[in-house]
Amino acid sequence: MPKHGKRYRALLEKVDPNKIYTIDEAAHLVKELATAKFDETVEVHAKLGIDPRRSDQNVRGTVSLPHGLGKQVRVLAIAKGEKIKEAEEAGADYVGGEEIIQKILDGWMDFDAVVATPDVMGAVGSKLGRILGPRGLLPNPKAGTVGFNIGEIIREIKAGRIEFRNDKTGAIHAPVGKASFPPEKLADNIRAFIRALEAHKPEGAKGTFLRSVYVTTTMGPSVRINPHS
């Protein structure tokens, strides 16, 4: 195991490893644990009672956090015709069609989210799949990033909508705000994310769905929480 520095060990002493904290307690505690010189991201890590090898048990969805993420999300919209203007008016940072696909093929990646209309997905998938797919940026209807209602999609992402999906170990990791948020807003965002997770419980999943849930900051130790508190 890697050795942690003195700062981390001091923070670890503030966390009771045998206690399962309420969401409100954790929201206050993680603010104390965020001592880095930058505004740390607060994340939720959940271990799910699913078999990730089975496609019918994979969990994937989106949730609009009530207080956003506390950061500006750079949205790229790929569309054509009238939808280009709609995307621009909705606040997309970059909008284009074939020319922007070529720009990405040339190495440009200055964006955080990609949305597209269905009529361009053939080109997007075939040309950009290998580039955007591994980065989790490829537009997908299940993730709510493909649709002719592209203006609505962009506004939701800008307001703090996040995508979540389990990894190959059956765990999910998602940002829920910044350490600078008031604890009440962090707690609201955590609860909204947990409700969204539970709404996506697969029918075939047996036993306890949320096996363990932790809240952590970018550089701090994790705090186990009761997801129903």
Curated annotation (Swiss-Prot):
Q: What InterPro entries does this protein map onto?
A: Ribosom_uL1_bac-type, Ribosomal_uL1, Ribosomal_uL1-like, Ribosomal_uL1/biogenesis, Ribosomal_uL1_3-a/b-sand, Ribosomal_uL1_CS
**A single GO cellular-component term on record:** large ribosomal subunit
UniProt keyword list: Repressor, Ribonucleoprotein, Ribosomal protein, RNA-binding, rRNA-binding, Translation regulation, tRNA-binding
Q: Which GO terms describe its molecular function?
A: rRNA binding; structural constituent of ribosome; tRNA binding
Superkingdom, natural source? Bacteria
Entry keyword annotation includes RNA-binding:
yes
Q: Which GO terms describe its biological process?
A: regulation of translation; translation
Signal peptide annotation: none
Keyword tRNA processing applies: no
* Record-stated family: Belongs to the universal ribosomal protein uL1 family.
Complex and partners: Part of the 50S ribosomal subunit.
**Alphabetized NCBIfam families for the sequence:** rplA_bact (TIGR01169)
Q: What does this protein do?
A: The L1 stalk is quite mobile in the ribosome, and is involved in E site tRNA release. Binds directly to 23S rRNA. Protein L1 is also a translational repressor protein, it controls the translation of the L11 operon by binding to its mRNA.
**Protein name (Swiss-Prot/TrEMBL):** Large ribosomal subunit protein uL1
Gene from which this protein is expressed: rplA
